[in-house]
C-alpha cells in the first residue's frame, strides 16, 4: 500500500465514524471532531477516544480508556496487531463502555 492509498482508506474510516455519530440517536451526548489526521470522540462524561493515522507505518491507532491499539490493514479489515480483533469491534466495545449504552458503527 502506498501513502495515498493509506490516506484514502483512513479517510473512509473517519467518514464512516463521523456519519454514524451524526446519526446517533442514543441518550448520551457524543461529539466527534477531526483535526488534521486525528479524530476525537468526546462523551458526555468527558472521556475521549482518540483515533489517529500513523503514515510511516500505514497504521491506524486507537486510544481508549481501556488502552491503546495499533491496526494494520489485512484484506479489507483493520486488524489489531496484538489481539487480532477488528478495529470496529474494539471501537464499539470502548464507545459502549464510555457512553454507558450500546454504540454501533456498523
From Swiss-Prot:
Gene that this polypeptide is encoded by: cyaY
MF annotations from Gene Ontology: ferric iron binding; ferrous iron binding
Protein's recorded name: Iron-sulfur cluster assembly protein CyaY
Family: Belongs to the frataxin family.
Biological-process GO terms, alphabetical: iron-sulfur cluster assembly
Keyword list, A-Z: Iron, Metal-binding
Entries under SUPFAM superfamilies matching the protein: Frataxin/Nqo15-like
Known function: Involved in iron-sulfur (Fe-S) cluster assembly. May act as a regulator of Fe-S biogenesis.
GO cellular component terms listed in the entry, alphabetical order: cytosol
